[in-house]
Amino acid sequence: MSKEDAIEMEGVVTESLPNAMFRVDLDNGFNVLAHISGKIRRNYIKILPGDRVKVELSPYDLNKGRITYRLKKK
């Protein structure tokens, strides 16, 4: 799968799970299990429940995703 194939959506982190996994409620109402991308991990960006994030979903499995960006708080 190339980067162009990924589906990018926004959502809110609802739960923090072990091994840097998070449960994210997407804006369209779906609930996905997401892990942190390497750039977020390398730059020590903390993600907490309640944060708005961008999630990349694979077109093959829409229940799992990768958190690629934490959006700024308003």
UniProtKB/Swiss-Prot annotation:
Main subcellular location of this protein, as a coarse class: cytoplasm
The protein's name: Translation initiation factor IF-1
InterPro entries for this protein: NA-bd_OB-fold, RNA-binding_domain_S1_IF1, S1_domain, TIF_IF1
GO cellular component terms given for this protein: cytosol
Entry-linked PANTHER family: TRANSLATION INITIATION FACTOR IF-1, CHLOROPLASTIC
Similarity comment text for this entry: Belongs to the IF-1 family.
Domain S1-like span(s) in chain numbering: 1-72
Assembly, per entry: Component of the 30S ribosomal translation pre-initiation complex which assembles on the 30S ribosome in the order IF-2 and IF-3, IF-1 and N-formylmethionyl-tRNA(fMet); mRNA recruitment can occur at any time during PIC assembly.
Sorted UniProt keywords: Cytoplasm, Initiation factor, Protein biosynthesis, RNA-binding, rRNA-binding
Membrane-spanning intervals of the chain: none
Source organism, top-level taxon: Bacteria
Cytoplasm recorded as keyword: yes
Subcellular location: Cytoplasm
MF terms (GO), sorted A to Z: ribosome binding; rRNA binding; translation initiation factor activity
Gene3D superfamilies membership: Nucleic acid-binding proteins (2.40.50.140)
A Pfam family matched in the record: eIF-1a
Function: One of the essential components for the initiation of protein synthesis. Stabilizes the binding of IF-2 and IF-3 on the 30S subunit to which N-formylmethionyl-tRNA(fMet) subsequently binds. Helps modulate mRNA selection, yielding the 30S pre-initiation complex (PIC). Upon addition of the 50S ribosomal subunit IF-1, IF-2 and IF-3 are released leaving the mature 70S translation initiation complex.
